[in-house]
């Protein structure tokens, strides 16, 4: 545990609550002190849903500390069982209440014997895993609970469907554009004549989990959540899974080709007919996807050689890096992820695409790296957007964690062929806005900006005289801050405190700026 004002991935119990509140008719009991109960407000604000989050807090107060939690926890479980009639109740502590070292598994076992609902304890180590890891493990635990029970009762139907079908695993509440991505994945599978068997956990029912093995394969669009469930289903039931994220034209083709191989494995047995998705890939790439045509346009060619920094979760950071380089000709100076647990996969994916790889969950390291590189644009999380504002570098948000403005009401998928179009817009506009500011500087306008000293400036303690400021204002806005920082670095190296026009001319001559 550490105290921080910014965390890329939240505490473990948030991941468990996200999975629980994604299922239909599942309730979560959170054993925690007041102050840990912000999930309900956060979900209601960001997802803008009509219903309250199905989460109840079992408060740890002075009475609990004096007498223990057993009676209170069981009472809350039975009360919610009577009031809500859920199919499943998930009991979870928080990292704070875990300090008490209470046997919550025992409480859950006792409550399950006297309640009508199923009750399970989210078996997560709150000191070792973060929000995303906990969500992945909780989803696997729920799926395993129902499949193991059905298998033990000999009621599990493992016969595959008559037509090609798939489970989509990993779509859940508060995910980055997850609702839009799910619609796009449904459209993709419908175009390929593949039936949707189940989507979990978002909108899924735990009663239907016993039908998961009937699908021909599993589709896991994000590595962060769903991969453990897919691996469990593969090990126990021999179900193949596709984990290539269908983001960008190149990876879209690779994902569909993997689906093609999985379908054709069972097609001769089930329908005596193989499928061919190559014409679909060719048609979508050449004639339907506007992003593919845009990548060959003169506007996109203007981005060739532009520098950028990419940072986010492993899935989105890796995909945006590859799209930037392969499909738009942008140079990625540094790419990184805060998913330290998935660092090996991340490095393997992008080692040939960028100059430097950064694996960290410390936002100050990311900020320092961006200040050193001084890219033309940033693609990251909400924190990188803040950093970009301080450095006057445009930033496109491509990954969680995000603020409410990245939960759009309109249709904005990142996956599928429509997703490639949506990604191209913020990528291109992030660079184009620099020229817009330059034109405003030249011709004037109501939002013309004055020169501002940035808090991340390299020249802390340096003094610019009025004449040197006027000289600096003649430099186009979209490169002005970069020139300013280079002049300040030059002055520091020479031991100069007062920056005059002579210092500017000397720096420009030496540095070629």
Swiss-Prot record:
It comes from the Eukaryota. It is found in: Plastid, Chloroplast. It is an enzyme of class 1 (oxidoreductase). Its main location: plastid. GO terms for biological process: light-independent chlorophyll biosynthetic process; photosynthesis, dark reaction. Signal peptide: none annotated. Pathway: Porphyrin-containing compound metabolism; chlorophyll biosynthesis (light-independent). Keywords: 4Fe-4S, ATP-binding, Chlorophyll biosynthesis, Chloroplast, Iron, Iron-sulfur, Metal-binding, Nucleotide-binding, Oxidoreductase, Photosynthesis, Plastid. Binds 1 [4Fe-4S] cluster per heterodimer. The cluster is bound at the heterodimer interface by residues from both subunits. It holds the Pfam family PCP_red. [4Fe-4S] cluster binds at residue 36. The keyword Iron applies. GO terms for molecular function: 4 iron, 4 sulfur cluster binding; ATP binding; metal ion binding; oxidoreductase activity, acting on iron-sulfur proteins as donors; oxidoreductase activity, acting on the CH-CH group of donors, iron-sulfur protein as acceptor. InterPro entries: ChlB/BchB/BchZ (IPR050152), LI-POR_suB-like_C (IPR013580), Nase/OxRdtase_comp1 (IPR000510), P-CP_red_C (IPR042298), Protochl_reductB (IPR005969), Protochlorophyllide_Rdtase (IPR016209). Substrate binds at residues 434-435. One of its GO terms (cellular component) is chloroplast. Belongs to the ChlB/BchB/BchZ family. PANTHER family: LIGHT-INDEPENDENT PROTOCHLOROPHYLLIDE REDUCTASE SUBUNIT B. Component of the dark-operative protochlorophyllide reductase (DPOR) that uses Mg-ATP and reduced ferredoxin to reduce ring D of protochlorophyllide (Pchlide) to form chlorophyllide a (Chlide). This reaction is light-independent. The NB-protein (ChlN-ChlB) is the catalytic component of the complex. NCBIfam families: DPOR_BchB. This is Light-independent protochlorophyllide reductase subunit B. The lineage of its organism: Eukaryota, Viridiplantae, Streptophyta, Embryophyta, Tracheophyta.
């Amino acid at each position: 545990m550490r105290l921080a004002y910014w965390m890329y991935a939240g505490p473990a119990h948030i991941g468990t609550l996200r999975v629980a509140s994604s299922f239909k008719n599942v309730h979560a009991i959170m054993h925690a002190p007041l102050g840990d109960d912000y999930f309900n407000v956060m979900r209601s604000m960001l997802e803008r849903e009509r219903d309250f989050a199905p989460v109840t807090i079992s408060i740890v107060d002075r009475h609990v500390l004096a007498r223990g939690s057993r009676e209170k926890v069981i009472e809350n479980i039975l009360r919610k069982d009577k009031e809500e009639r859920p199919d499943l109740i998930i009991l979870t502590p928080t990292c704070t209440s875990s300090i008490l070292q209470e046997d919550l598994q025992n409480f859950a076992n006792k409550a399950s014997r006297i309640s009508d609902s199923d009750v399970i304890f989210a078996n997560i180590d709150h000191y070792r895993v973060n929000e995303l890891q906990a969500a992945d493990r909780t989803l696997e635990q729920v799926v395993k609970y129902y499949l193991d029970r059905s298998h033990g009762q000999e009621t599990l139907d493992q016969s595959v469907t008559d037509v090609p079908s798939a489970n989509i695993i990993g779509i859940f509440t508060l995910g980055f554009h997850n609702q839009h991505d799910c619609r796009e994945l449904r459209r993709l599978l419908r175009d390929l004549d593949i039936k949707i068997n189940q989507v979990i956990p978002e909108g899924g029912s735990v009663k239907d989990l016993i039908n998961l093995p009937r699908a021909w394969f599993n589709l896991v669009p994000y590595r962060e959540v769903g991969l453990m469930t897919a691996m469990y289903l593969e090990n126990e039931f021999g179900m193949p899974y596709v984990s290539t994220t269908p983001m960008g034209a190149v990876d879209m083709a690779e994902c569909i080709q993997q689906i093609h191989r999985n379908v054709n494995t069972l097609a001769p047995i089930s329908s005596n007919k193989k499928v061919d998705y190559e014409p679909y890939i060719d048609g979508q790439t050449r004639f339907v996807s506007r992003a593919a045509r845009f990548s060959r346009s003169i506007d996109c060619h203007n981005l060739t050689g532009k520098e950028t920094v990419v940072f986010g979760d492993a899935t989105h950071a890796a995909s945006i890096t590859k799209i930037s380089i392969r499909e738009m000709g942008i140079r990625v100076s540094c790419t990184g992820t805060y998913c330290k647990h998935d660092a090996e996969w991340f490095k393997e994916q992008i080692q040939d695409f960028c100059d430097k790889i950064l694996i960290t969950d410390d936002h100050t390291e990311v900020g320092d790296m961006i200040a050193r590189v001084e890219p033309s644009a940033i693609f990251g999380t909400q924190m990188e957007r803040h950093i970009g504002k301080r450095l006057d570098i445009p930033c496109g948000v491509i990954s969680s964690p995000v603020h409410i403005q990245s939960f759009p009401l309109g249709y904005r998928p990142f996956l599928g062929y429509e997703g490639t179009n949506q990604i191209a817009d913020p990528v291109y506009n992030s660079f184009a806005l620099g020229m817009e500011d330059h034109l405003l500087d030249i011709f004037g306008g109501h939002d013309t900006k004055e020169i501002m000293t940035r808090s991340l400036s390299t020249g802390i303690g340096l003094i610019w005289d009025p004449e040197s400021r006027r000289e600096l204002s003649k430099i186009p806005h979209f490169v002005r801050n970069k020139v300013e920082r280079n002049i300040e670095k030059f002055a520091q190296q020479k031991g100069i405190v007062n920056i005059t026009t002579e210092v500017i001319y000397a720096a420009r001559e030496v540095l070629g700026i």
